[in-house]
Structure formats: structure tokens, C-alpha cells
């Protein structure tokens, strides 16, 4: 009997796939036989991630793409579809942090710097992938990386929280509208996870002493903690799973 998690022949796109949660997604997908395409804006990090992913024996493609640039997303998606003829799953993961001096002191430029990547970029990426999934006639799986900031107030981070809340709403709307085309869409709410974006804060004694005791599993998340959910949501095992918000946080938001 074949495994429901066998991704042989599956083409997966992971934005921000060169580190952190995105690399965790990509590693799980590659380990289960998928062809993996990673997008990122840092060529060296892309190259290093692709080299590591190729150790699983499958095809890995690295591409420079700034998801906040709509024309770049359109071109990069067309390149992926042209090369492989399909996109079976798209992990809308690329994002940037946001921390303003204060809410009233937040500038228009700072607001749009975060929304440009986290929300506009997610829209461009998901829209192009859904177009391809509908056109190929087989549907596919869209997965958004959200955050607890979508639910809980983050001081000086109103722009970041708004962007992550928007992803949940976008995901649910895609799930409802495009189910008839076989497109599923789900969002993942990630807890405190080691990454280039978060590690400087997580590794300080003061932050660890304040926050880590509130994580029931008593550790920070790692990219590898997101490998399994990526495989599940990409595979046929999740064929009846859409419109959901899945929390992976070590129990933090339950405490």
C-alpha cells in the first residue's frame, strides 16, 4: 500500500524557504519526495538551503524573488509552471518583522514596509499559484504562515499583527471560493520559533526568563517542527481539510 504522505511527482513552492519555518517546510517536503522550489531574496542563503535540501535526493530549485514586487511574483510563478507544468502546493511563508517606536509614532513608510511583504506579497503569491492550480485542473494546496500576533495585541507591532490577521482571513476566503476547483487553503499560526527574524530576541536572558516559562513544552520552536504539517497539508492525507487555522506553538497560546 502506498503511503498517503508520498509526495513523489509533487511540485511544491515555498516562499522564504531558505531559513526558519520556510526551510522546515521545504525540508519535510523534500524528504518525502517532492520537487521543491524555494524563493528568497538572499542568493547565498538560497544556495545553502538548496544544497542541504538536495541531500534528500530530489530536485530542488532556488530562485531570487521579492514577493512584494508583483511583477517579480508573476514572472517567477510563470517560470515554475513553465518548467514543471504544475504547482501542487504553495507555502506562502515569506515575511518581515515589524517594530515601531510606538503606535502613534509609526510612520507611513514603516506601515507599508511590513504590509508590502507580509500581506501584499502573500496576496500576489497566492493569487498566481491559485490561477495555476485552477488552470492545470487538478487543484492544489495553499498554506499561509500566520502568527499569534493575529490574535493577541503586540505593542508597537500593529502593522505586523494586522498583516498576520489578514492572512487568516485571506486563507479562509480562498478556501471557500476555490474549493470547487480542488484548491484547499489553510493557515498555520506559529508560536515562538527560532529564525533569523526572531532569534536575536529569543536568545536574550531577559526575554527567555519572561516568555519561555509560559511555553508548556519549555523550548522554542524550530524549523523542523513544521516539517510534518507541511507534508500533511501538501499530501492527499489532507484532501478534506481546508479553511482551517492550525496552531503550532508548544502550547503557548493555551496557557
Question: Where in this protein do the model-derived segments appear?
Answer:
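Short C-terminal tail/terminal secondary-structure segment
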Residues: 2-4, 97-100, 152, 217, ...
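Active-site helix of classical SDR
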Residues: 126, 163, 171
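Substrate-binding pocket helix/loop in short-chain dehydrogenase/reductase
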Residues: 101-103, 107-115, 211
Amino acid at each position: 500500500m502506498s503511503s498517503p504522505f508520498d509526495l513523489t511527482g509533487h511540485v511544491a513552492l515555498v516562499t522564504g524557504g531558505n531559513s526558519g519555518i520556510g526551510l522546515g517546510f521545504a525540508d519535510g517536503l523534500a524528504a518525502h519526495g517532492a520537487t521543491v522550489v524555494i524563493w528568497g531574496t538572499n542568493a547565498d542563503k538560497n544556495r545553502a538551503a538548496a544544497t542541504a535540501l538536495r541531500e534528500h535526493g530530489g530536485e530542488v530549485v532556488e530562485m531570487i524573488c521579492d514577493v512584494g514586487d508583483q511583477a517579480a511574483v508573476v514572472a517567477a510563478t510563470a517560470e515554475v509552471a513553465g518548467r514543471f507544468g504544475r504547482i501542487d502546493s504553495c507555502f506562502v511563508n515569506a515575511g518581515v518583522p515589524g517594530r515601531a517606536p510606538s503606535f502613534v509614532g509609526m510612520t507611513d513608510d514603516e506601515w507599508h514596509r511590513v504590509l508590502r511583504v507580509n500581506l501584499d506579497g502573500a496576496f500576489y503569491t497566492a493569487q498566481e499559484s491559485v490561477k495555476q492550480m485552477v488552470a492545470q485542473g487538478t487543484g492544489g494546496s495553499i498554506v499561509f504562515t500566520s502568527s499569534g500576533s493575529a490574535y493577541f495585541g503586540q505593542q508597537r507591532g500593529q502593522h505586523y499583527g494586522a498583516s498576520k490577521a489578514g492572512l487568516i482571513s485571506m486563507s479562509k476566503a480562498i478556501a471557500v471560493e476555490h474549493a470547487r476547483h480542488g484548491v484547499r487553503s489553510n493557515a498555520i499560526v506559529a508560536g515562538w520559533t527560532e529564525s533569523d527574524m526572531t532569534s536575536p530576541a529569543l536568545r536574550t536572558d531577559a526575554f527567555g526568563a519572561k516568555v519561555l516559562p509560559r511555553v508548556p513544552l519549555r523550548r522554542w520552536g524550530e524549523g523542523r517542527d513544521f516539517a510534518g504539517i507541511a507534508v500533511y497539508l501538501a499530501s492527499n492525507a489532507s484532501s478534506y481539510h481546508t479553511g482551517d487555522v492550525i496552531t503550532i506553538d508548544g502550547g503557548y497560546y493555551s496557557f
